[in-house]
C-alpha cells in the first residue's frame, strides 16, 4: 500500500492519519512539538507545578476546547477512537463519551447584571423551570426593540439567501457593515456586532467576512433551537488526558509512525512531483539538529498557514499559482491565546462559558473543574488549588486596556489586567464573585513569547481569520502537483472557519484526493454539510432566481413562496417533535422511528377516543404520520422506507375495493357522511392504510430478521389480531367509523374483521423481506397484490365466521 508523509501533527494531521491508516495506507507524521500532539488543541503539564508529586502537574492549555453542536467531522472521528479503562484495557467506550454538555451561557458586562441563558432550548423539566424563571425576571439587555428587530431581520436574510449570494456577495461585506453597526447603540455593537466576532473567531468586526461570521452565528442559532442537540459541549478533563493521548495511542497501535521535534524546511520537486521533503530533526536541541530527506508516495501538508507560507518556493508557485495566494493569505491571522488562573476555591460562576462582552481584550472563560468529574487537583502544585478558570484572550493587537495593548504587556501584566477586566464584569452591584486573593498561580500560554528587543510579545501560533475577500485566496485540498495535498484550516471547506472542525474536514478532503489519485477502492472519508433548516429552501431558490438576474436580496417574497415555506415549516415542526421524542426516549435509526410513529398513532387514537374530536382528527393523524415517515425517508435517503411508502400508497388505493364491499356490499361498515369521500371511503383512508401497514409490517420484518420468516409471520398475525382491533375500538369512540352491531363482535369489531386483519398482516413480513432487496417497481407489484389480498382476507374470514 502507498506511503503517505504528513507534515504537521495537529488535529488536521492526526485526522488525515486516522482516515488513511484505517484504509490500509502507510503513514508517517512529522510534528514540530517535542512532546505533545494535537497542535493548538493540546493541553500541557505546566512546568514547575509538580511540587508534591513528580507526575502531577497543573493542567494548562493554549486555549479551552469548545465543541458546538454543529461540529460533525471532528466528533465523528472521536466516535472512532477507543478509550482505555484505568487498567489499560479497552473500556468499550469511545473518546466521544468524554464530551459533556454545558447548561448555560453567561454574558458578563461592566457595571451591569450578567445575562444568563440556557445553552439551547430546555430539554429537561429542570432546564424548563430555569428558562421560565430567567424569562420572568430577565435582565435587561440594553438593546432597543428596533435593534432586536433589525438583528432578527439580518439573521432571516442570511438564512434565506441562496448559497451563491453568500459565497460571492457576503464574502465581500464586513460583519460591521452588514450589521449596520454605525447606526445603532454601543450596547448593540458590544453584544451583537463586536462581541460575536471577537469571541467566536478572534476577528475584527470591520474586516471579518459576513459569509463566515454569519454562517457560524446561524449554525449556533439553529443548534440552540433544537432541544435534542447539545449546543455547547466541553471535554470532561484536560484535553490530552481525555482525547489527544488516547488518539495518538490508537494511531500508533494501528501503525502510524509519529516523529516529534521535527518540521519541514524544504519541499524538493522533480518532474512536477514532490521527490522528497527535507526535515530538520531535534529542533529543541540545536547541537543535535540535522536535516534528513524523507520520501513517500504522497505528501499531506497539515501545518498552519504561517508555517506553510515559509515552505513556499518560486518553484512551487511555478507549478501551482495557489501557493502565491497562500503567501498573500498568511498575514490574515490574529491572536487567540489562553491564560489559566488556578484558584483556591472551586467557583463555578456559570454552568458553561462566560462572554465578557465589555472587556477590552475580548475575554471568554469557563470554570472547568465542574465538568471534570473525579479529576484530582489535591496533589498538584501546592495542594491548595481547587478550581481552574481558563480564559481566552482574543484581542491582543487592536484595543487598549489602561492605554496598553495586550501584546505590549509582560506575562504578569497580562495576568493582572485580564483579572481586572474579569472583576469589573463579575463583581457588580456590591456582589463579590471573584477576588485576587483566590489566585494561587496562573499560566500564560507559552506561545506568547516576550521579545526584549522590540518590547512586545510574539505569538508563535496565531490563528487564521476569515477576512473580507479571503475565500478567493484559499486553496482546495488538491494541488497541481499530483502527489501533494493540503490539510489545514485555511483549506476551502464547508466549515469555513479556523477550528478543529475545519481542520478535520480539510484532512478528510485531502484523504479523498489521495484515494482518487491511488485508484484505491476504499470508501471516501465522509464530508458533512451544515444542517440548514430545509423549510427555507423555497426562499433560497427564489433568491437564487433573483441573483441570476442581477437583483439584490429582498425579503418581500411572493405570497406563494411564503405559503409553501409556511407549509414546509409545519412539516419541519412535525419532524422536530419526532426528533425530540427520539431524544427523550433514546431511540435511534429507522426501526426506532417507525416504532415511535406506531406508539404516537396509538396514543393519538386513544386520546381522540377519550376526547371525541371527530373525523378531522383521523385526517390529521393519517396525513401527519405519512408526512413524518416521508420526511425521515427523504432526509436520510432511506431507500427501504421510500419503497415501503410507495408500497403502502398502492395498497391503500387498491384497498378501496374492499372498503366498498364492506360499506355497500355486505353493509357492515359506516363512515360519517360529513367528510370528503373517495368512492365509498373517506379521502384519507388510502394514507391511513399505508401508515398502519408500514408500522405493523415493519415489526414483523424486524422479528423475521432475528427469528426467521415463519416466526415473524405468526407474530405479525398475532399483532394484527391485537393492534388493529384496538385501533378499531378507538376509531368508534373518536367518531371516525363504526360497524353495524351483531352478536359476532369483540370490542365493537366483527370477528371476521379481526380474523381478516390478522390474515392481512400475516403476509407482510414475506413482502418486506423481499422488498428490501428488490427494485422499485416491485413495490407497486407487491402493493397491488396486498391490496387484493385485503379483499380476499375479509371475504374469506366473512365466510368462515358467518
Language model region names:
Residues 21-47:
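Glycine-rich FAD pyrophosphate-binding loop
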Residues 575-802:
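Aromatic-rich, lipid-facing transmembrane alpha helices and their immediate juxtamembrane interface loops
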Residues 287-298:
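Core beta-strand elements of the Rossmann-like FAD/NAD(P) dinucleotide-binding domain
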Residues 2-29:
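N-terminal Rossmann-like FAD-binding beta1-loop-alpha1 element of flavoenzymes
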Residues 513-568:
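Active-site-proximal substrate-binding core of FAD-dependent oxidoreductases
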Residues 224-235, 296-298, 303-474, 480-505, ...:
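C-terminal segments that line or cap access tunnels to active or ligand-binding sites in enzymes
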Residues 150-273, 282-283:
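Active-site/ligand-binding neighborhood in enzyme catalytic cores
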Residues 51-150:
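Dinucleotide-binding Rossmann-like beta1-alpha1 core, especially the glycine-rich loop
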Amino acid at each position: 500500500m502507498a506511503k503517505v508523509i504528513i507534515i504537521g501533527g495537529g488535529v488536521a494531521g492526526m485526522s488525515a492519519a486516522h482516515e488513511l491508516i484505517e484504509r490500509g495506507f502507510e503513514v508517517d507524521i512529522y510534528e514540530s512539538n517535542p512532546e505533545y500532539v494535537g497542535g493548538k488543541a493540546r493541553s500541557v503539564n505546566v512546568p514547575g507545578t509538580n511540587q508534591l508529586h513528580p507526575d502531577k502537574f497543573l493542567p494548562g492549555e493554549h486555549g479551552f476546547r469548545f465543541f458546538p453542536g454543529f461540529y460533525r467531522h471532528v466528533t465523528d472521528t472521536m466516535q472512532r477512537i477507543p478509550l482505555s479503562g484505568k487498567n489499560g484495557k479497552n473500556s468499550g467506550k469511545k473518546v466521544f463519551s468524554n464530551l459533556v454538555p454545558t447548561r448555560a451561557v453567561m454574558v458578563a458586562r461592566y457595571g451591569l447584571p450578567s445575562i444568563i441563558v440556557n445553552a439551547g432550548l430546555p430539554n429537561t423539566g429542570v432546564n424548563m423551570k430555569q428558562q421560565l424563571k430567567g424569562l420572568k425576571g430577565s435582565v435587561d439587555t440594553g438593546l432597543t426593540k428596533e435593534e432586536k428587530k433589525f438583528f432578527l431581520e439580518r439573521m432571516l436574510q442570511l438564512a434565506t439567501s441562496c448559497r451563491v449570494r453568500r459565497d460571492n456577495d457576503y464574502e465581500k461585506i464586513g460583519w460591521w457593515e452588514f450589521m449596520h453597526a454605525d447606526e445603532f447603540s454601543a450596547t448593540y455593537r458590544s453584544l451583537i456586532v463586536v462581541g460575536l466576532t471577537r469571541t467566536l473567531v478572534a476577528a475584527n468586526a470591520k474586516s471579518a467576512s459576513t459569509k463566515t461570521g454569519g454562517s457560524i452565528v446561524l449554525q449556533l442559532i439553529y443548534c440552540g433551537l433544537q432541544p435534542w442537540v447539545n449546543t455547547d459541549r466541553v471535554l470532561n478533563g484536560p484535553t490530552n488526558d481525555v482525547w489527544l493521548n488516547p488518539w495518538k495511542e490508537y494511531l500508533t497501535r494501528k501503525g502510524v509512525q509519529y516523529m516529534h521535534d521535527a518540521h519541514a524546511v524544504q519541499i524538493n520537486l522533480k518532474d512536477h512531483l514532490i521527490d522528497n521533503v527535507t526535515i530538520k530533526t531535534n529542533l529543541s536541541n540545536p547541537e543535535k539538529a540535522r536535516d534528513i530527506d524523507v520520501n513517500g508516495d504522497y505528501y499531506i501538508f497539515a501545518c498552519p498557514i504561517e508555517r506553510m507560507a515559509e515552505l513556499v518556493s518560486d518553484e512551487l508557485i511555478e507549478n501551482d499559482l495557489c501557493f502565491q495566494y497562500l503567501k498573500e493569505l498568511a498575514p490574515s491571522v490574529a491572536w487567540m491565546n489562553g491564560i489559566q488562573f488556578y484558584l483556591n476555591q472551586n467557583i463555578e460562576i456559570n454552568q458553561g462559558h462566560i462572554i465578557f462582552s465589555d472587556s477590552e481584550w475580548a475575554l471568554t472563560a469557563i470554570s472547568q473543574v465542574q465538568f471534570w468529574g473525579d479529576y484530582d487537583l489535591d496533589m498538584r502544585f501546592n495542594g491548595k488549588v481547587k478550581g481552574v478558570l481558563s480564559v481566552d484572550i482574543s484581542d491582543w493587537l487592536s484595543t487598549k486596556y489602561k492605554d496598553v495593548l495586550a501584546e505590549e504587556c509582560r506575562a504578569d501584566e497580562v495576568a493582572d489586567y485580564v483579572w481586572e477586566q474579569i472583576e469589573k464584569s463579575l463583581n457588580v452591584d456590591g456582589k463579590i464573585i471573584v477576588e485576587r486573593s483566590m489566585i494561587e498561580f496562573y499560566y500564560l500560554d507559552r506561545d506568547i513569547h516576550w521579545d526584549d528587543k522590540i518590547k512586545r510579545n510574539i505569538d508563535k501560533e496565531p490563528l487564521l481569520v476569515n477576512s473580507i475577500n479571503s475565500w478567493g485566496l484559499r486553496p482546495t485540498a488538491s494541488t497541481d502537483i499530483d502527489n501533494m495535498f493540503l490539510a489545514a484550516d485555511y483549506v476551502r471547506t464547508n466549515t469555513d472557519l479556523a477550528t478543529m472542525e475545519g481542520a478535520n474536514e480539510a484532512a478528510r478532503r485531502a484523504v479523498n484526493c489521495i484515494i482518487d489519485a491511488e485508484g484505491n477502492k476504499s470508501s471516501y472519508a465522509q464530508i458533512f454539510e451544515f444542517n440548514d433548516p430545509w423549510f427555507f429552501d423555497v426562499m433560497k431558490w427564489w433568491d437564487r432566481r433573483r441573483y441570476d438576474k442581477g437583483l439584490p436580496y429582498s425579503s418581500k417574497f411572493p405570497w406563494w413562496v411564503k405559503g409553501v415555506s409556511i407549509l414546509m415549516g409545519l412539516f419541519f415542526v412535525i419532524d422536530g417533535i419526532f426528533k425530540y421524542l427520539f431524544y427523550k426516549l433514546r431511540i435511534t435509526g429507522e426501526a426506532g422511528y417507525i416504532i415511535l410513529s406506531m406508539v404516537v398513532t396509538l396514543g393519538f387514537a386513544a386520546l381522540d377516543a377519550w376526547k371525541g374530536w371527530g373525523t378531522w382528527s383521523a385526517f390529521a393523524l393519517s396525513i401527519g404520520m405519512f408526512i413524518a415517515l416521508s420526511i425521515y425517508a427523504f432526509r436520510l435517503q432511506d431507500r427501504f422506507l421510500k419503497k415501503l411508502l410507495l408500497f403502502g400508497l398502492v395498497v391503500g388505493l387498491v384497498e378501496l375495493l374492499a372498503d366498498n364491499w364492506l360499506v355497500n356490499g355486505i353493509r357492515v361498515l359506516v363512515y360519517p357522511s360529513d367528510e370528503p369521500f373517495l368512492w365509498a371511503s373517506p379521502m384519507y383512508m388510502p394514507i391511513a392504510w399505508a401508515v398502519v401497514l408500514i408500522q405493523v409490517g415493519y415489526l414483523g420484518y424486524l422479528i423475521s430478521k432475528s427469528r426467521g420468516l415463519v416466526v415473524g409471520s405468526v407474530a405479525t398475525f398475532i399483532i394484527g389480531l391485537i393492534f388493529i382491533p384496538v385501533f378499531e375500538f378507538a376509531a368508534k369512540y373518536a367518531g371516525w367509523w363504526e360497524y353495524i352491531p351483531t352478536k359476532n363482535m369483540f370490542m365493537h369489531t366483527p370477528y371476521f374483521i379481526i380474523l381478516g386483519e390478522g390474515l392481512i398482516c400475516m403476509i407482510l413480513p414475506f413482502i418486506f423481506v423481499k422488498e428490501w432487496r428488490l427494485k422499485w417497481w416491485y413495490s407497486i407489484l407487491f402493493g397491488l397484490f396486498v391490496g387484493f389480498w385485503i379483499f380476499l382476507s375479509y371475504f374469506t374470514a366473512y365466510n368462515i365466521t358467518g
